[in-house]
């Protein structure tokens, strides 16, 4: 991952995200990384129906699917988990660069 993205995770404890190929044609998908209070990192892929995003509708937990979720111990393990989820770690950035909806 890029240094600025690594710094976002470690210094500001901010979320990072990247678009990924959705498993369903009528869904959009992202991988996001969330720093946890424990010092670990949650790496998750989510898929959301396109119509909810395109129509700017509110959606909830039940509207999303999570084809991948993993907790990793350190920032050094994030790249591997992100690859497992189907994304190149170099594409990770602040959520607004990938239109991450959460």
Residue ranges and their predicted role:
Residues 1-7, 52-102:
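Mixed-charge, Lys/Arg-enriched low-complexity segments
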Residues 1-28:
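Negatively charged, low-complexity tracts enriched in Asp/Glu with abundant Ser/Thr
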Residues 11-12, 36-38, 94:
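Generic detector of low-complexity/intrinsically disordered segments
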Residues 26-33, 82-83:
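Short, charged low-complexity linear motifs
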Residues 31-60:
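A short, structured beta-strand/loop element
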């Amino acid at each position: 991952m890029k240094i600025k993205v690594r710094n976002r995770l470690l210094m500001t404890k901010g979320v990072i995200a990247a678009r990924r190929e959705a498993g369903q044609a009528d869904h959009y998908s992202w991988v996001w990384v969330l720093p946890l209070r424990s010092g670990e990192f949650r790496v998750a892929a989510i898929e959301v129906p396109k119509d909810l995003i395109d129509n700017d509708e509110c959606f909830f937990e039940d509207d999303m699917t999570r084809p991948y979720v993993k907790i990793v111990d350190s920032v050094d393990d994030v790249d591997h988990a992100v690859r497992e989820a189907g994304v190149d770690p170099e594409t990770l950035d602040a959520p607004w660069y990938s239109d991450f909806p959460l």
